[in-house]
Amino acid sequence: MSADTMRAPTYNVAHLLSAVQSEMTRGSEKGDPSEKGLKVTLEDRDLWRRFSKLTNEMIVTKTGRRMFPVLSASVTGLNPNAMYSILLDFTPADEHRWKYVNGEWVPGGKPDSPPPSTAYIHPDSPNFGAHWMKQCVSFSKVKLSNKLNGTGQIMLNSLHKYEPRIHVIRVGGPEKQRLIRSFSFPETQFIAVTAYQNEDITQLKIKYNPFAKAFLDIKEKGEHEFEDCHDHQQPRYPQLGSWFLPSAGTLCPPSPHHQFPPSLGMPSPVSHSCAVERYGSLRSHRSTPYPPPPYEQKYSPTSAYATDSTASSLSLLPAHEAWSPLGSSTHHTSNITTSPSHQYGGVWPPVTSSAVQPASSCGVGSPVHTSLLRAAYSNYSQPSTSSITGVPRPPAGSMSSSCAGYQNYNSPSEIHGGLNSTDAIGSYPTVGNQLCPGKVGAWSPLTPPSPGV
């Protein structure tokens, strides 16, 4: 490294001196070397007055809380070339302890013993008079506390009224420090609290405090986002309203026609029809209905049942869409097929998915889907004796298809063949030694024929 680079560089300090001189000149026009015209003016006086009308409150905490409104003032009449320090302290405004009752502050007893006197020194202190006069003096960093923690915070008693005071002190030079003047403003009085008591004060703090506005914006934003989200979800899921709150037209209207007579031991016709109509209306609102659950039939009366398709053995709920309306005059019947493996095949003929033939005579009924009959019949176990509900049944082969008035009924309503819903299943009249459900006659017990006949 050469000797030229080792030498200290030559600085031009003229621009630094000019900057200091201009800084001193900026506040000189407001100065007064005699300090006789010293004046301190409160900034934001109108805002302070709005809080004062409602009895202003300031929060005090253990760690300290900043003031709002911020205490700031403009100073004029200082000696621009003299050094000054500006301090802030708080003096009790009265001799009362206050309490908030029925929406207003009222005196609540004698005051507590005053805390140790403390003062807040402005961070720019000490400084030239020109510096203090060039712009307003703000005490934005002062913190109010209810604990004496020795960190330079101002300690105040809660529920006591205070008034801030600004002190201007001249420092430096051969002269000793001396107090020039103190200034106080009645608009800045407040009651120290640990939590805001007056809701109006809280609203003013939120409205005018820039830091509280951020909290208010977050709150309003959250509410708007919730409303927007709620509005956006409504068109995406229009079925929710009718799914949870169906319209009055889908809530179980009274039906004079019953699907199941009480004699079959089925559930209440009204409740069942309500359930069918209700779930039918609800399923119509789904974009993808639930798949129909399989129906497990524990007892199969005939071997022909085992050969039916799976769709014909579904539960009642998904099958209701294929039901024929009540009151239809169409008669359904099929050729009687007696299964050799079933003893009473003639009485309960098998139901298959094949096409049915029109009936010849013996009763009028209402056609119902095959799954309805099977679901109704599956509730009854196959009897081991030759009687059902007290009525004997003929042995196998004793019932022929030539029985006048016999049909292959496909529904419980057809089995009744016009009987009253309160009659028993076994109360059918007979033709010879055979049951004829379509004929309504007097009670006549049946006796099975002798083996030799």
From Swiss-Prot:
Signal peptide: none annotated. It comes from the Eukaryota. GO terms for molecular function: DNA-binding transcription factor activity, RNA polymerase II-specific; RNA polymerase II cis-regulatory region sequence-specific DNA binding. Keywords: Developmental protein, DNA-binding, Nucleus, Transcription, Transcription regulation. Pfam families: T-box. Gene3D superfamilies: Transcription factor, T-box (2.60.40.820). GO terms for cellular component: chromatin; nucleus. Residues 283-304 are annotated as: Disordered. GO terms for biological process: cell fate specification; heart morphogenesis; mesoderm formation; positive regulation of DNA-templated transcription. The keyword Transcription regulation applies. Residues 47-217 bind DNA. The keyword Cytoplasm does not apply. Its main location: nucleus. PROSITE patterns: TBOX_1 (PS01283), TBOX_2 (PS01264), TBOX_3 (PS50252). It is found in: Nucleus. May be involved in the transcriptional regulation of genes required for gastrulation. This is T-box transcription factor T homolog. The lineage of its organism: Eukaryota, Metazoa, Echinodermata, Eleutherozoa, Asterozoa.
